[in-house]
């Protein structure tokens, strides 16, 4: 028999979402400001309602059952719509509005000062939380923990980071496309040699750990050529790789998007840029579409629409 929503305490759905996020009765109870016993009783009611265990105990915490996994996206959408409904008055008199972004650094460093000024000008009492883009950022957008992401994707046909492979629930807008360039300090010995593929591969490289991988499309293109670079140092992001490339007493070189010239000028890093020594077809595979990403449930959220427009305008002005 079909069950009526009027017979369900909607607070139980909040408890269910927090259990899915935390995978722990104790942690969920802490976030709800109730006792673990109260959460356990709520879970018992949910199990009876859905006629399913929902979670099973494991040494690593609560593990969701297949039914719970199948409901995760719908539950997140339900909660997001509820938050938007309760936030309606704030769109008229915004107080305490929160902006949560996940962005690639140094891209955010270039525009954050201007973006934050625009946010505070429009929403004086807003709070802003920025996290570095990482392997979990897409899931964070899906879970409703991040309003909008801003990062580069890849164009190589074998890449796992193609725009066409984004989850169906994620919407996006490409703001600009860029090519990676090679960055060397001003007195690097490679600058005294002919700039070709052999010179590029002769020196040790700084790579970044991107989406839990130390290699990316550049390495795929080199593999197609039967070549390989020596990755001597792996760092979390472009910001750190540029900083290290600028340091004296080593011959490391970095590869980062060309837009990083704005970051280098801002911080006066003594770096020189050189194009990758590849032909046009190979460079095409390395094109990076820098993209805004958000959940489709937020496509008409006034806060997100305004934020997208603000970032778009700043990109055209600063990048």
UniProtKB/Swiss-Prot annotation:
InterPro entries: LysR-type_TF (IPR050389), LysR_subst-bd (IPR005119), Tscrpt_reg_HTH_LysR (IPR000847), Tscrpt_reg_YidZ (IPR023746), WH-like_DNA-bd_sf (IPR036388), WH_DNA-bd_sf (IPR036390), YidZ_PBP2 (IPR037402). Keywords: DNA-binding, Transcription, Transcription regulation. Pfam families: HTH_1, LysR_substrate. GO terms for molecular function: DNA binding; DNA-binding transcription factor activity. Residues 25-44 bind DNA. Coiled coil: none annotated. The keyword DNA-binding applies. Residues 8-65 form the HTH lysR-type domain. It comes from the Bacteria. Involved in anaerobic NO protection. Belongs to the LysR transcriptional regulatory family. HAMAP family: HTH_type_YidZ. This is HTH-type transcriptional regulator YidZ.
């Amino acid at each position: 028999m079909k069950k009526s929503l009027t017979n369900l305490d909607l607070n139980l759905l909040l408890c269910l979402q927090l259990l899915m996020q935390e995978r722990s009765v104790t942690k969920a109870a802490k976030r709800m400001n109730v006792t673990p016993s109260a959460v356990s009783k709520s879970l018992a009611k949910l199990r009876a309602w859905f006629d399913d265990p929902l979670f099973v105990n494991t040494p690593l915490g609560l593990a969701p059952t297949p039914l719970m996994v199948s409901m995760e996206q719908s539950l997140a959408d339900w909660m997001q719509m509820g938050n938007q409904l309760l936030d309606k008055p704030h769109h008229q008199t915004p107080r305490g509005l929160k902006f949560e972004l996940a962005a690639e650094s140094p891209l955010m460093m270039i525009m954050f000062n201007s973006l934050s000024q625009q946010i505070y000008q429009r929403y004086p009492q807003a709070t802003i939380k920025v996290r570095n883009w990482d392997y979990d950022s897409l899931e964070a957008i899906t879970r409703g923990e991040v309003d909008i992401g801003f990062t580069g994707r890849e164009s190589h046909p074998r890449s796992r980071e193609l725009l066409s492979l984004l989850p169906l629930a994620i919407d996006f807008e490409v703001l600009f496309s860029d090519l990676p360039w090679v960055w060397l300090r001003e007195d690097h010995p490679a600058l005294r040699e002919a700039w070709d593929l052999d010179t590029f591969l002769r020196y040790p490289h700084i790579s970044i750990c991107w989406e839990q991988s130390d290699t990316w499309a550049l390495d795929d293109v080199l593999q197609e050529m039967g070549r390989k670079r020596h990755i001597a140092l792996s760092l979390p992001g472009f910001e750190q790789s540029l900083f290290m490339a600028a340091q004296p007493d080593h011959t490391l070189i970095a590869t980062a998007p060309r837009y990083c010239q704005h970051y280098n000028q801002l911080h006066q890093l003594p770096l020189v840029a050189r194009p990758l020594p590849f032909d046009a077809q190979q460079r095409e595979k390395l094109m990076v579409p820098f993209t805004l990403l958000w959940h489709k449930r937020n496509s008409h959220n006034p806060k997100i629409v305004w934020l997208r427009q603000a970032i778009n305008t700043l990109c055209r002005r600063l990048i």
